[in-house]
Amino acid sequence: MSVLVNRFRRNGDTLAVAILIVFMFVFYVCWAFHLPSLFAPDETMRMDVPLYIFKHGCLPRGDDPEIINRFWGTSYGFSVYGSSLFAIPFMWASELFGYADITSLTIAARISNCVLAAINLVLIYVISKQLRFSKFASVLSVLLLGMLPQYAFLAAYFNSEQLEFLSTSCVIVACLNGKRNCWSYGSCVAVGLSLGLLALSYYFAYGAIIAAICFFYMDQALRLRAGNFSHREKMVELVFKPVVVFVSSMAVCGWFFIRNAILYNGDFIGMPTSSKTAEKFAVTELKPSNRNTLKSQGYPFWVLFKQPFYGIYWPEWVYKSFIGVFGGMNIFIGETYYFLYSNFLLVGLLSGVVGALLICKSKQLSAFLIPPMLMVLIPVVLSIYYSWASDYQAQGRYVMAGFGILSLVTALGFDGLCAGVMVLMRKDSAIEIRHVIQEEMDDSQMMPIDELRIVYRRNKTVVLLQGILVLFYITLFGIIVTRVILPSCFGGFV
């Protein structure tokens, strides 16, 4: 019995996370089966691409009449569609079991999204372990993401966001692994493959590419400065290994951009050609030339934060739909629950930011806060520009690429608050902030940011506090499910 107890103490967090992920995956799948298609934004238009691939066994042109939307005059075949490629095996499996109608194939594509969401939760846990989080913080980081209403909603229907979240987490895991292994060739290949996957996910995730480049060169610069490297070795580290990363990423995503460039006269992104196609085939009011964007009306971009447009105040709608707005942006969870969610997350996030700044107060460590900040902020900047210059879309899903990082920081913040409670109590409790340094590291070398951890002796009061935090978040999600999701968004697939 004592052996089992000790084993549970050592691996209790892993078991808890496994149970949590399985539970959330089952919930995502159940919702995917029962979410009406009218409540799944853009799903019908986005499904045209995987349905075309399934039917014809080849990739579509973006301007193929079979997939051009009759209202918008364009298709998702111009932009990256990694999520469609991931859905195809699930659609084949559905056909294998005798379900090849449109409804069954759509559900199969939705299930592929549920799988992506569950794998992403696993990666968030892996990242927390790479960062040497406590068991409580590791479990909480997965819980915060998996039970965020908007994340659950995005897992329940076919979209590009879940692959965006997953690929961003893959980049983080690969970069941390590369740092730990001094950017071995295998690590560089892993970073390249993850960046290639990210490039096929969604344009709003591309901030992670810039963040990964910054992380690589900052770590390499510090490592090379601390060590005794020859000129040739420095060239290998700073030039040849980035080439390995680039080639590896192109092996995954290069075909798409080369194909686009060939098909659309050098337009490897596909956006300009998509706009030209929309100008030609869209209904009159939806043609790009007839859209009154804020930019075309002469407004500066910051006007989004000063006044509402079209009855929508951009910051408010982004904030609410970041937490949870379902259907066609018309099913809200209620002001009380927005208040509870936002304040709960804000307390943990602010505490986590303060804790990270305190831990990384040396200049060398502070520099490593830049890449995660870029991952969080660049999607926000892209969303602001898109709403200002192209299409006024105040949607939280466009800025969620970095929420995995925010969930980790928030979990770290709550962990720090619990540690602070122990310091204040001063009863049979101690806090030890310990820097785990690589063996034989001299004082001139950088202290690894991914090897900082807070170790403390637990007591009953702190365990109770941690339990209350977890129970509060689970209860809040349960209330949203019973009062909003089940009555409004669980009406059976149509």
Regions found by a protein language model. Name each.
Residues 218-221, 240-349, 483-484:
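Membrane-lumen/periplasm interface segments of specific transmembrane helices
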Residues 12-44, 51-62, 71, 244-262, ...:
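Transmembrane signal-anchor helices characteristic of membrane glycosylation enzymes that use polyprenol
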Residues 256-257, 336-339, 418-494:
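Transmembrane helical bundles and short interhelical boundary loops of multi-pass, membrane-embedded
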Residues 104-115, 304-376, 382, 403:
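Membrane-interface anchor segments at the N-terminal boundary of transmembrane helices
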Residues 3, 177-179, 208-247:
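Perimembrane helix-loop-helix junctions
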Residues 107-132, 170:
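Transmembrane-helix motifs of polytopic, lipid-linked glycan transferases
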Residues 99-103, 124-147, 166:
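Transmembrane-helix signature of polytopic, membrane-embedded enzymes
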Residues 150-163:
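Short acidic/glycine- and proline-prone juxtamembrane loop motifs at membrane-interface regions
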